């Protein structure tokens, strides 16, 4: 696909619902007693994989546009699926299901696409095995023998919301309490939603304690816009001359707003308006104006708050004056692709001064950039980041696979080009 270019980006946009919250609303709604009504659901491929898996375990789920109704069967109400569960490209679905399925009274198996089969599951398998789980393999396909679990006291080796959530979900079924010690704060959508549903769960800064739970009570979930999807427009509006973009109804959970902090640190003109709380999640309208950006250093405890936004932050760095250093981001190597290597390889095609490091990259920005034939590696965030990059590059650019954006943002290109009209 040839990437069309726009001269300015002006207007208001509503990005699709938050992917993390959409996944969790379906999963926890399935385990709750009663009916969970979800509005603003992200109908991307990953979240639809979650729905498919729970339907195969006997959960009645209705989809009507962005509204999803989950008829929960209770914590012990899942049924043994007739076939292997297929999670597509979704690491969230795969890892969180491990936590739920480990404590069931039936056996299951899980696999995904070729990308998922290369992604490490050992980081989930290890703590679950410490709880008594019986899981065969550390890469998909995974074979899970349902068994009785016991609580553990576990220190997370890396900040990972997926691993943390898998342990929390297993803890709902375990004998005794489960305590998790995070090394850095990761996204806490699971904790917020479970607390709203009546789980016996407490959070004390970086320590989470979950006790076995008999019942979860269904709650309605209004899914805010996904800040990871909004990030592409925040960077576009900042780097493109004569631009002003407002992204409405975006979730600004403090564990997710690293992108805003970094862009402001780089000099971006960003304001938050209409800030309010919805079902425990903080929501706002975010406006960005064209800005003169400067390089910065991104690392340390902010990384878990923007891990998915690092490719688009790298784009901002290209058009910022001076050097930007991204470090402590080894986690990028085990995403849909090795995103450190992918960003460096594709940016090199454009003549960008970028160097790969063991835990990130160094970008010397503020120089002219030319277009290129880009490879997305089947990675939705690479496809969207490269589309933003191409806007300010001289000459033509192409994408080998634009459809992979559907994983998290099915209407990305429609929304993108509306801003240029």
Regions found by a protein language model. Name each.
Residues 1-421:
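Structural preference for solvent-exposed beta-strand-turn elements
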């Amino acid at each position: 696909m040839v990437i069309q270019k726009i001269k300015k980006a002006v207007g208001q946009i509503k990005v699709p619902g938050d992917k993390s919250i959409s996944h969790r609303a379906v999963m926890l709604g399935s385990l709750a007693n009663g009916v969970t009504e979800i509005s603003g659901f992200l109908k991307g491929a990953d979240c639809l994989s979650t729905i498919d898996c729970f339907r195969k375990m006997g959960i009645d789920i209705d989809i009507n546009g962005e509204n999803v109704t989950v008829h929960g069967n209770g914590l012990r109400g899942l049924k043994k699926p007739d076939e292997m569960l297929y999670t597509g490209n979704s690491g969230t679905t795969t890892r969180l299901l491990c936590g739920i399925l480990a404590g069931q009274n039936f056996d299951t198996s899980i696999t995904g696409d070729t990308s998922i089969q290369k992604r490490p599951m050992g980081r989930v398998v290890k703590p679950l095995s410490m709880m008594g789980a019986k899981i065969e393999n550390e890469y998909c396909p995974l074979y899970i023998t349902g068994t009785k679990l016991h609580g553990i006291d576990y220190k997370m080796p890396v900040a990972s919301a997926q691993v943390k959530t898998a342990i929390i979900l297993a803890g709902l079924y375990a004998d005794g309490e489960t305590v998790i010690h995070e090394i850095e704060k990761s996204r806490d959508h699971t904790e917020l939603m479970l607390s709203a549903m009546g789980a016996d769960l407490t959070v004390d800064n970086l320590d989470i304690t979950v006790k076995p739970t008999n019942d979860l009570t269904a709650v309605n979930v209004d899914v805010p816009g996904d800040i990871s999807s909004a990030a592409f427009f925040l960077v576009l509006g900042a780097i493109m001359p004569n631009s002003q973009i407002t992204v409405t109804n975006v979730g600004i959970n403090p564990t997710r707003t690293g992108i805003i902090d970094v862009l402001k640190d780089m000099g971006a003109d960003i304001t938050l308006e209409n800030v309010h709380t919805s079902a425990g999640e903080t929501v706002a309208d975010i406006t960005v104006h064209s800005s003169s950006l400067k390089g910065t250093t991104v690392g340390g405890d902010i990384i878990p708050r923007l891990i998915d936004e690092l490719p688009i932050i790298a784009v901002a760095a290209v058009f910022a004056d001076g050097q930007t250093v991204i470090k402590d981001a080894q986690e990028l190597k085990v995403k849909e692709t090795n995103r450190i290597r992918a960003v460096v390889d594709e940016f090199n095609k454009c003549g960008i001064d970028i160097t790969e490091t063991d835990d990130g990259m160094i970008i010397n920005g503020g120089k002219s950039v030319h277009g290129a034939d880009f490879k997305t590696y089947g990675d939705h965030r690479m496809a969207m980041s490269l589309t933003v990059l191409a806007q300010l590059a001289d000459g033509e650019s192409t994408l080998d696979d634009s459809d992979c954006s559907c994983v998290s943002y099915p209407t990305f290109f429609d929304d993108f080009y509306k801003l240029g009209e």
